[in-house]
Amino acid sequence: MPSNNPDLDLSFVYEIADGSDEFIVESIGVFLEQSPGILQEISAAIDAGDWAGAAASAHKIKANLGFFGMNLSHALITEIESACKAGGQNPAEIKAKFNQLTGIIDDAFFKLNEIKAEKEANL
């Protein structure tokens, strides 16, 4: 069941859930619980010029973005991680990409909360 969000394709999640709404609710719940903190870590590290810290935090969220079919977000976080690993040569560009990423992810969070609520109603 693909969502209306252009950067959210839950096909893989639904496939491995194999009909288990509980798995879907739990997976979405963990993502929604952990991701804001990781995004805050990235933001703080970028603001502080801590490129190694920003890259490490970006790496932590990258797999989850792929898991939820957030391909644009995954591509952006990969670019951010690479730019930070390279020493943050262009901080303004990194910040702009991060701001773009957070806007996209905020939309996905909203949609994921809706999906989670729908699935919880089935439990």
Residue positions per predicted region:
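Helix-loop "lid/cap" segments that line or gate small-molecule binding pockets
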Residues: 11-18
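An anion-binding catalytic pocket shared by soluble metabolic enzymes
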Residues: 61
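Conserved HATPase_c
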Residues: 25, 51, 55, 95
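Short helix-adjacent coil turns
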Residues: 42, 46-54, 68, 87-89
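Active-site flanking loop/helix segments enriched in acidic
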Residues: 19-23
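Amphipathic, coiled-coil-like alpha-helical segments
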Residues: 2-7, 27, 32-33, 38, ...
